[in-house]
């Protein structure tokens, strides 16, 4: 485990001791994956995952009885969470809501011990929550067998953003049936501006590939096409975090990719799982490692996009 020492029912991480409970509990029945194995996974990937969690309020998808049972989608910390778990107040209509910020390995392990399988993060950071540092387009195919169509849409968006607008963007599998394309921003504009750019870019794809991709929100209006979803680009909304496990049979993982990997027609979501990702990380540098070097302002991006017409 990366920077973490595990001894029986205790883990030592980030200078604190996390007591583990009921590690033999099976969370993924079809795969016989236990809570202990989930904890081991998050301990192992902490060094890769934490940079994408740090300073971001999170939402937790917890499954105390396993994925076949009720999900607890939790934003606020429970009263019993230890003091060293960071909290932050997030403004909302009529007041504030307290969120957890997972900024150290001990918190990651502690939440895994709470049967938190999925980690979902804000697209903005503490100190500037109203201004995103990323914009994301979620390519959501009509069905689980349509992943390749979503893959092609992600490549088309890369060609638009990077090839035509000279904006470096990043891609990950969602761990579900689609992919996310992220564009890093410099936090100068609010979510409305960022979402406007995402909408404009998605509309270009629809104009170029109308039989494959749509921005129609109603499922019955999509006609089997890939949905280019930009609604996550809103204040206090979340997206699944890089390297998060998904609460689905197979324990697929939301995995950052090199664009060369996304270009592989044989790519499937099942390639990256809780049990296989360790080998990948041992041999593949983090595809998103350079993201902090590429930050764009939305106004410039929109001007470049408008210049195409």
Language model segments and positions:
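C-terminal accessory nucleic-acid interaction domains of nucleic acid-metabolism proteins
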Residues: 1-32, 39-40, 54, 94, ...
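Signature for HUH/AEP ssDNA processing cores
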Residues: 100-175, 185-193, 309
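Short secondary-structure junctions
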Residues: 51-53, 161-168, 209-210
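Long, highly charged amphipathic alpha-helices
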Residues: 44, 152-160, 196-204
């Amino acid at each position: 485990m990366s920077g973490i020492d595990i001894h029986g029912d205790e883990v030592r991480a980030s200078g604190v001791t996390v007591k583990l409970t009921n590690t033999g509990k099976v969370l993924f029945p079809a795969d016989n994956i236990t809570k202990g194995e989930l904890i081991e996974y998050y301990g192992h990937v902490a060094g890769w995952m934490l940079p994408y969690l740090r300073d971001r309020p999170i939402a937790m998808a917890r499954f105390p009885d396993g994925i076949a049972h009720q999900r607890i989608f939790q934003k606020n910390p429970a009263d019993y969470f230890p003091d060293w778990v960071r909290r932050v107040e997030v403004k909302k209509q009529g007041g504030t809501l307290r969120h957890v910020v997972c900024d150290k390995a001990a918190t990651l392990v502690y939440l895994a011990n709470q049967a938190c399988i999925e980690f979902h993060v804000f697209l903005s950071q503490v100190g500037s929550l109203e201004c995103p540092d990323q914009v994301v387009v979620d390519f959501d195919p009509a069905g689980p067998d349509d992943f390749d169509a979503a893959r092609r849409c992600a490549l088309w968006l890369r060609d638009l953003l990077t090839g035509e607008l000279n904006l470096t963007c990043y891609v990950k599998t969602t761990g579900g049936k689609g992919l996310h394309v992220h564009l890093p921003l410099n936090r100068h504009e609010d979510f409305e501006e960022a979402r406007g750019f995402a909408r404009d870019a998605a509309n270009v794809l629809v104009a170029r590939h109308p039989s494959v991709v749509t921005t129609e929100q109603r499922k019955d209006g999509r006609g089997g096409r890939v949905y280019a979803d930009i609604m996550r680009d809103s204040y206090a909304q979340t997206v699944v975090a890089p390297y998060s496990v998904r609460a689905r049979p197979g324990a697929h993982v939301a995995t950052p990719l090199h664009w060369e990997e996304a270009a592989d027609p044989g790519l499937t979501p099942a390639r990256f799982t809780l049990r296989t990702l360790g080998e990948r990380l041992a041999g593949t540098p983090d595809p998103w490692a350079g993201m902090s070097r590429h930050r764009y302002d939305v106004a410039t991006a929109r001007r470049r996009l408008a210049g195409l017409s």
